[in-house]
Curated annotation (Swiss-Prot):
Native species: Homo sapiens
GO molecular function, one term: ATP binding
Residue list for modification N6-acetyllysine: 202
E.C. no: 6.1.1.20
Domain of life: Eukaryota
Record annotation: effect of changing residue 329 to T: In COXPD14; results in a 4-fold decrease in the catalytic efficiency of amino acid activation mainly due to a decreased affinity for ATP; does not affect Phe binding; affects the stability of the enzyme, leading to a significant decrease in overall charging capacity
Reaction catalysed by this enzyme: tRNA(Phe) + L-phenylalanine + ATP = L-phenylalanyl-tRNA(Phe) + AMP + diphosphate + H(+)
Disease linkage: Combined oxidative phosphorylation deficiency 14: A severe multisystemic autosomal recessive disorder characterized by neonatal onset of global developmental delay, refractory seizures, and lactic acidosis. Biochemical studies show deficiencies of multiple mitochondrial respiratory enzymes.
Enzyme class per UniProt: ligase
Main location: mitochondrion
UniProt xrefs under NCBIfam families: pheS_mito
GO BP annotation list: phenylalanyl-tRNA aminoacylation; tRNA aminoacylation for protein translation; tRNA processing
Keyword Aminoacyl-tRNA synthetase: yes
Protein name: Phenylalanine--tRNA ligase, mitochondrial
Length: 451
């Protein structure tokens, strides 16, 4: 893994810093093309050191894997920057909920939390949501850990338990989330989610239902594909209906009343039954969110034993890319006025169609290497590519796998597409970056180069 390799070869930092400094000279375009500051090439700190983040100190240990590239993004809060496309989506959803769901005194039923710290405990991110200790979503290769006890949240669901425990029963949470992932136009290590939760008391759920006073929220039975063991079928079906109706109205508000929707059964550790919503957009079915009836064990542990509820989570980038026809997720981090001014509208519901910036030519280079005998994770390589290449890297494709018939060693060949969003890249500058990546892969990942 990157961490163990760094601890074995800390001297490699000095070389990479020197190399990166050479590459970055003469590149002054801060929005997209400049190499990160030289120190950012050191992807982790050794155990015993401390990382300062958002005014707090976090001791490093063998679980720490937060890259400096990601650290520079923490606190940007794109969803709170006025007229940013992610802010527009958030405001449209918030406006819809404020208008459609009103409490007894005319105030909004749903409260909104859009400035919660992205640093959470592993208990908040996993255990509070009933995610098993051996669940693959906990893997170091998929998350950004500050240390064994703290991490950058992988989903806004990490705040569900705390808000329920505080006595809230209807709320939206919006924030940046962090996951180690592949590199292409649809994936970025930081993206933004909007989470919603609503709980119902027996009176609230069955109000207006004929003979509703005789119905119950809970029973002791067996779990099935349609309900949890503690829920009555009547309660589950009403919660499911309210959830799907709420989301159908939201999507109609965003995309128009003629939108075609379908529901797909799925699995999440913290809801059952669980669903994904797909929309038919220009003839293509697109998955836009996940949702379900909240696991009663989670609700009970937060102190709301007399209530049943639903939850959903959607990606703001996903919706914005569909609604505004934005082709590349990197654009959300662009500071180019040609991008941002397209979303400076007086009415948040005004239709916007993104006008592409000039498409500069790509520079494509391949990298091949033999994998180490153990501890290689593909997301470690992707993280290294992002750290060395920054936002110049448009995508990375694994184009070939080969197992040597005699040594049984495995070789990977990746095709890396470099493209600047604001100017043409030269072969020379890409060659310097690519060479630094090759050397970093050998020294930090323990691979054997085939270049």
């Amino acid at each position: 893994m990157v961490g163990s390799a760094l601890r074995r070869g800390a001297h490699a930092y000095v070389y990479l810093v020197s190399k990166a400094s050479h590459i970055s000279r003469g590149h002054q375009h801060q929005a997209w093309g400049s190499r990160p500051p030289a120190a950012e090439c050191a992807t982790q700190r050794a155990p015993g050191s401390v990382v300062e983040l958002l005014g707090k100190s976090y001791p490093q240990d063998d679980h720490s894997n937060l890259t400096r590239k990601v650290l520079t993004r923490v606190g940007r809060n794109l969803h709170n920057q006025q007229h940013h496309p992610l802010w527009l989506i958030k405001e449209r959803v918030k406006e819809h909920f404020y208008k459609q769901y009103v409490g007894r005194f005319g105030t909004p039923l749903f409260s909104v939390y859009d400035n919660l710290s992205p640093v959470v405990t592993t208990w908040q991110n996993f255990d509070s949501l009933l995610i098993p200790a051996d669940h693959p979503s906990r893997k170091k290769g998929d998350n950004y850990y500050l240390n064994r006890t703290h991490m950058l949240r992988a989903h806004t669901s990490a705040h569900q338990w705390d808000l329920l425990h505080a006595g809230l029963d209807a709320f939206l949470v919006v924030g940046d989330v962090y996951r180690r992932d592949q590199i292409d136009s649809q994936h970025y290590p930081i993206f933004h989610q909007l989470e919603a939760v609503r709980l119902f008391s027996k009176h609230e759920l069955f109000a207006g239902i004929k003979d509703g006073e005789s119905l119950q929220l809970f029973e002791q039975s067996s779990r099935s594909a349609h309900k949890q063991e503690t829920h009555t079928m009547e309660a589950v079906k009403l919660v499911e209906f309210d959830l799907k109706q709420t989301l159908t109205r939201l999507m109609a508000h965003l995309f128009g009343d003629e939108l075609e929707i379908r529901w797909v059964d799925c699995y999440f550790p913290f809801t059952h039954p669980s669903f994904e919503m797909e929309i038919n957009f220009h003839g293509e079915w697109l998955e836009v969110l996940g949702c379900g009836v909240m696991e009663q064990q989670l609700v009970n542990s937060a102190g709301a034993q007399d209530r049943i509820g639903w939850a959903f989570g959607l990606g703001l980038e996903r919706l914005a890319m569909i609604l505004y026809d934005i082709p590349d997720i990197r654009l959300f981090w662009c500071e180019d006025e040609r991008f941002l001014k397209q979303f400076c509208v007086s009415n948040i519901n005004q239709k916007v169609k993104f006008q592409p910036l000039s498409k500069y030519p790509a520079v494509i280079n391949d990298i091949s290497f033999w994998l180490p005998s153990e501890n290689y994770a593909e997301n470690d390589f992707y993280d290294l590519v992002r750290t060395i290449g920054g936002d110049l890297v448009e995508k990375v494709d694994l184009i070939d796998k080969f197992v040597h018939p005699k040594t049984h060693k495995t070789s990977h060949c990746y095709r890396i597409t470099y493209r600047h969003m604001e100017r043409t890249l030269s072969q020379r500058e890409v060659r310097h970056i690519h060479q630094a990546l090759q050397e970093a892969a050998v020294q930090l990942l323990g691979v054997e180069g085939r270049f």
